[in-house]
Amino acid sequence: ATATQSAGGSLDEETRARLGKEPVLVEYARSFFPVILIVFMLRSFLVEPFRIPSGSMIPTLWTGDFILVNKFAYGIRLPILNAKIMNIGEPKRGDVVVFRYPEDPSTDYIKRVIGVPGDRISYHDKTVFINGVAAGQQFVGPYTEFPTGIPLPSRLEVESLGEKQHILVIHPGFAGRLEQGEWTVPQGGYFMMGDNRDNSNDSRAWGFVPEKNLVGKAGMIWMNWN
């Protein structure tokens, strides 16, 4: 009787152990939940990876480059609602910014800030004028681009926006649809342009980027294919 009771007691303990053991799926979920939560917090408030979709920012950024976007540079926003809960800074001329395309907010664009609220921007003869003053441009050297597989002779120039400098691609003989114009940047808006000036769909075509559409400031390139 004692042996039977002992065996029965052991069996009961094994049964209780099996019943008390969590399913494998629950164990995995419990293990991965903190990781998923951390990733969600990082992507929502701190940094988010972004893949360059086009050549409009050549030579600064190339199609296929992966960059990290600093999402708190211009304030902390609530996910989904996109409501700003903390103001940290404002975009400055020369910043490279990721934003939601005003005509289709489901699409992210990346361009350089040329005009901030109150600025008068004009573009003539491939030169930017800010409040009547031409942005400095200095010739760097020749450059050949192959946008359609056919060589397109171009040149590289250094453009100065205040203390910030960056390199542009200019196509001297290319008369694009965004050759000239004048704009006054409204409060709460920003004027954006690509560094590949004659091959960029930007504020010259569709207007200003509202402050609420800003995603963050472009940071380091963490992967490219060149």
Please provide the spans of the model-predicted regions:
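Hydrophobic membrane-insertion alpha-helices, especially the h-region
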Residues: R30-F45
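Soluble "head" domains of membrane/secretory-pathway proteins
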Residues: A1-V26, F45-R51, S56-N226
